[in-house]
């Protein structure tokens, strides 16, 4: 499941609220005409070689194109990601995200962030939306 993989790789070290927020960003993108209209296409969005493999560091979510294995190693964390993904897909969402379509960790300061509206910081992630 694409959404669960994204939660696992992007936020498994975050509290539940942070994991839900990462999932909600994907769903918000699906509902935004600037992005693909399904979860897997949003998660795997980026530049790809003709072979279909992602180009290193040229995708929306860093885990997908960092050159490392995308296999899950922590089964308990992956199962929890699956649970969160299912709940978010079934419509569980939280108003505190206010349409967030972007986030990054507190360890980086991407140039795109200055053009977005800050919404909230949840643990190690900062969330934004188009302004």
What would you call each of these model-derived segments?
Residues 1-131:
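Bacterial extracytoplasmic/cell-wall-associated proteins, especially those involved in peptidoglycan
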């Amino acid at each position: 499941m694409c959404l669960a993989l994204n939660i696992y790789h992007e936020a498994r070290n975050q509290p539940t609220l942070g994991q839900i927020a990462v999932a909600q960003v994907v769903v918000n993108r699906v509902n935004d005409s600037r992005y693909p209209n399904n979860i897997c296409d949003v998660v795997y969005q980026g530049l790809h070689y003709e072979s279909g493999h992602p180009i290193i560091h040229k995708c929306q979510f860093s885990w997908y194109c960092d050159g490392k294995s995308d296999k899950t190693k922590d089964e308990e964390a992956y199962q929890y990601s699956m649970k969160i993904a299912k709940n978010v897909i079934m419509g569980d969402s939280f108003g505190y995200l206010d349409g967030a379509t972007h986030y990054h960790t507190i360890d980086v300061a991407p140039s795109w962030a200055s053009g977005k509206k800050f919404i909230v910081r949840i643990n190690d992630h900062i969330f934004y939306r188009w302004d």
